[in-house]
Amino acid sequence: MRLFGLILAGGEGRRMGGTDKASLTLGGRLLVTWVAERLGPQVEELAISANGDPARFAGLGLPVLRDEHPQGPLSGVLAGLRWAAAAGADALVTAPVDTPFVPGDLAPRLWLAGEGTCAVAEAGGRVHPACGLWPVAVAEDLAAWLAAGEARVMGFAARHGAARAGFPDENAFLNLNAPEDLARAESLLRKDA
């Protein structure tokens, strides 16, 4: 099993006042660094899905994949699947750039839950479909899904009967969508220190 990883960083950050979330800091470190350090050890190769100037990620030494047709997170997943397939990977594990506490066992738990098919994370009774596992075999179906105007991550996951991998810590998937979410994450860091 060859798992590749992808940090989804192509969003517009509207609820953060239009700020590029990858450039936000938490505990003095970039959000993209938090996710890279947590997801990177779980996968064979790691890349970033982002639009705009890729030079802003140069310090990470990771490939930056652009969306062919920006239509939300699934466009990034498609770019990642094509990259992973070209390199001989079996599946792609994704995590958004604004989930800095993503679990250190995300990839293996998704793989075990899905048994080689699609799988998404679940914690605290909530599904987190952007934290998912996507076999490279679904790439062309995803391209057709996007071409038909569909863009919902959970809709595509359901189309492929995605399994759910349960995680005990709901804070592991704390999504930093707004300034108050970032403040909450800072508070959690102080508690853990």
Swiss-Prot record:
Q: Which UniProt keywords apply?
A: Cytoplasm, GTP-binding, Magnesium, Metal-binding, Molybdenum cofactor biosynthesis, Nucleotide-binding, Transferase
Gene Ontology CC annotation, any one: cytoplasm
The organism's place on the tree of life at top rank: Bacteria
Instruction: Give a GO biological-process term.
Output: bis(molybdopterin guanine dinucleotide)molybdenum biosynthetic process
| InterPro entries associated with the record | MobA-like_NTP_Trfase, Molybde_CF_guanTrfase, Nucleotide-diphossugar_trans
How this chain assembles, per its entry, is:
Monomer.
Function according to Swiss-Prot or TrEMBL: Transfers a GMP moiety from GTP to Mo-molybdopterin (Mo-MPT) cofactor (Moco or molybdenum cofactor) to form Mo-molybdopterin guanine dinucleotide (Mo-MGD) cofactor.
Official protein name in the record = Molybdenum cofactor guanylyltransferase
